[in-house]
Amino acid sequence: CEVFLLVIPLAAYPLREIFHIGKDRRRGQRGTALVCSAAGYLCGFLWSMLTPCSWLVHILFLSYVISIAALLLLNVGFGLRASGHACSTTAPAFLLTWKLHPLFAIPSVLLIAAVYRSSLKLSRHSLPQLLAGSAVSLLACVISIMVYGVR
């Protein structure tokens, strides 16, 4: 599970440096990260379908697959810049809080606030772009829950 959520997406950064992907470093990292994340999440989703996994793992991987498809559509197709970082933190934070314990809301909100603050401070995204990323994530999560049912 961790291979698909962490190792494959993080491989984007060394891959970009080894193969010099993109005209400039930051743009190459963003593109490579998007491709590696999509590959990792899709492989994770397929893995979750082929092996016995918990309901939460199924929801998480389907949410990520829907989210990455929506981000590709919005960011590449329509030229918007919905935040991938906001997207990748919001639904998991919601799921942890909802399914494990309400006290997970505290670190979840702090994590999301840290993502927002760093993106705003570094001028990577505007508040509407961050909110769009979070909205994509929550919508994908709701769709995933509808597919697998509430437990």
Where are the regions a protein language model picked out?
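Membrane-embedded catalytic cores of phosphoryl/pyrophosphoryl-handling enzymes
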Residues: 58-151
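Selected alpha-helical membrane-embedding segments in polytopic membrane proteins
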Residues: 1-51
